[in-house]
């Protein structure tokens, strides 16, 4: 199973920020921000992100600082093949940033799928290489 690493998360947060101009966070199941367009938030606890990860529900926050480490915005849990990947949080008025959270989710799915396909392709290439190297040995045994 694939996991979202910091490199993939950074691709998503930076791309989405370029589109919407808002801060974007990736939050793990423990509620820790592991990638963000705001470097000061990386490694900090995000209470609503943690709650969204635990419940699997999208949570909208309508005011800053009502919850520990949380700003106004939307927090969307991301699943891939029914497996929790992360929570994507986007700062701003929920009605304005909701569409960007869904965009970030779609981009994340596409990048995970791309990695999955690359791994499958690499595995098949490795198997072909092994078979081609083993073929002369099998021919010698057959003689």
Task: Set out the residue ranges of the language-model regions.
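Hydrophobic, helix-rich cores of sensory/ligand-binding and other regulatory modules
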Residues: 2-143
């Amino acid at each position: 199973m694939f996991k979202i690493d910091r490199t993939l998360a950074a691709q998503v947060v930076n791309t989405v920020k370029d589109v919407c101009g808002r801060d974007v966070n990736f939050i793990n199941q423990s509620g820790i921000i592991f990638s963000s367009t705001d470097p000061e938030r990386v490694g900090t606890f995000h209470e609503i992100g943690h709650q969204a990860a635990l419940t699997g529900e999208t949570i909208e926050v309508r005011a800053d600082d009502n919850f520990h480490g949380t700003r106004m915005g939307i927090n969307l849990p991301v699943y891939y093949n029914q497996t929790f990947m992360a929570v994507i949080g986007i700062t701003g008025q929920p009605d304005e940033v909701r569409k960007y959270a869904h965009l970030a989710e779609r981009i994340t799915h596409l990048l995970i799928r791309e990695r999955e396909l690359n791994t499958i392709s690499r595995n098949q290439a490795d198997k072909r290489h092994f078979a081609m190297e083993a073929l002369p040995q099998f021919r010698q045994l057959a003689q």
